[in-house]
Amino acid sequence: MSSRAVTIGIALLPCLAAAPLAAQTRPAPLQDPVATMKAGRPIPGPVFETRNFTRAVENGTRDRTGRPGAGYWTQRVRYDIEAQLDPSKQRVTGRERVTYQNRSPDTLRSVPIYLRQNLFAPGSPRRESVPITGGVTLSRVEAQGAAVPQTKLDSETGPAGYEVFNTIMWIRLARPIAPGDSAAFAFEWSFTPPPSPSDGRQGRESDVYFLGYWYPQVAVYDDVNGWVTDPYINGAEFYMDMADYDVRITVPRGWVVGATGTLRDSASVLNARTMERLAAIRGKRDVAHIISASDPGPGAALASKGSTLTWHFTATNVRDFSWGAGNHYLWDATSALVPNRARGTTDTVAIHSFFRNSAAAAAWPIGGARFTRDAIEQLSLWLWPYPWPQMTSMEGVLTSGGMEYPMMTLMQPWADTLSLAGDLMHETGHMWFPMQVGSNETRHAWMDEGLTQFNTAQAMRALYGEPRTGGRSNDAEPGQRASYTRAARNGNDAALMTWSDLFPLNLYFIDNYNKTAQVLVALRGVIGDSTFHRALIEYGRRWTNRHPDPADFFNTFENVSGRNLSWFWVSWFYRAWPLDQAIGSVVEDGDSMAITVEDRGLVPMPVNLTVTRSDGSVVHVSIPAEEWLTGRRSITGRVPRVPAVLKVQIDAENAFPDLNRANQMWVSGGAER
């Protein structure tokens, strides 16, 4: 059987190659990306560029090639935190010192601090119901070395004071923070962690506590938007600056703690036998039982001094810090070996897995540590090397799915091993997006969830093959495609550029996760596998430890591919347009077979035809997307009539998320479908 590729002659029009972008000459379009109408169909216009982004380009902090500008900056923060968990009172108390460095060119007169546990305070706005715990109790607020009183903030000027607006506290400073200067803040606070199930991201059970967004955290001040203070309402996730953490967590003796960062002074909390077990697996891919079901409880693995133990962790260059504690945890550990091609070395990443001995969590002793190790190694190969010294996966408090934090994932108690593997792959994938490439999840969930969903499918296919029996359908491209197309066929779709908290709840997962993943598959089909992968890696290289805007993602892919893809971005991101390409007819026309393709949807996409002949040969025919931009609804092309054409199929490789596969195939002697 032979195969060859041709581009068919389009009736009356030449086939147009995609026009390359001139080097940094594309103007900044400010109009709405609504389509102009040609021949009754909408034609996507240029990508909308926000005024804030245009101003950042003018200020030299952004560049329309997708690179950070020469004057790009981010702020820097350090957190020193001491926290205590009292399970008998179901209470967490803490105190912290924050050092905030203003690396922007602007003078800051007020600073907003997130108090996200106020989601659980009476009267706080929220998208879904949650347990009411009372929220955060502040017992001390200090800025620039002096106590700050609670007051009404009617203006940016005036004496120092603070006011709490649900999940955000604004502090008006006694002295503005000039460019290049730093300011210190101190807080003492307490709260009751919500009972599980709470909000799907943290909580408590009788024997497990997991603390996410648990401490006062400075909001992001960036070069595009200034202070970003979207309230936390239990819909969209987060937007955070990179920071350094030094955290001490005091828990009752017998409770094991896992956390973001590296455990320091381990001899103060672990006994000699436990430390020997950890040392024995350092640099090895074997899985070791640090605390096993045959051990006499977690307390036997710990130091025996006093009624409490203080676990000390440090983490460098992470955007957040989370931790979990349990008094019935088993603990497995191993090592991931991550080749670092740039240095010609292999990095060792310590892998920790904490889980309870239960039928509901039956997959964890089989795969908790192993799947986490495999995810780190595979994603490091697909993307770029994992940068931190450890990774922890923890079972508990969630009733569905998982949640990501730097160097840490929280999971439901999976019993099915392949489902656990997929869940761990997805949440571990977030260690790249957004934990390194720090997009604003609060506004653009697709930038981390969609990319991670796409990367999950690639890594799962590499490790476990495809199709697979069992597991979660959304961890593979076919399942992602089915999820999106099923919803869209029923009219349930939204533009991906819809701000995250404004997404209809029934579409948040379908569109931000699965639709985006399928749009990336389609983009790969448009620009080619190798170009797509180069652009993805380049986007990560440019924006690791930085805050990309959607325009930076779009511009990077155009810059790397050398193509103007405005029609693609507008169609798939700014509009909820359907794709429906159909075989209109296949008829004899002299010495040729005339193949008419109809565009019955709205998205202009390339047409990839597979023509199968009677001698077994296969001809691949392509029509560029630009042909639809003239307003056409149908295009007719021709191939030689001999050898006889037996079958014509659109997109045989399922590269594009077409809503109606039933009209994409014609078979000789049969009904057109």
Give the positions of each predicted feature:
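N-terminal, polar/Ser/Thr-rich
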Residues: 24-93, 205, 566-567
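Glycine/proline-rich low-complexity spacer/linker segments in large multi-domain proteins
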Residues: 123-134, 190-245, 266, 331-336, ...
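Hydrophobic alpha-helical and helix-loop surface patches within well-folded domains
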Residues: 23, 43-49, 53-62, 313, ...
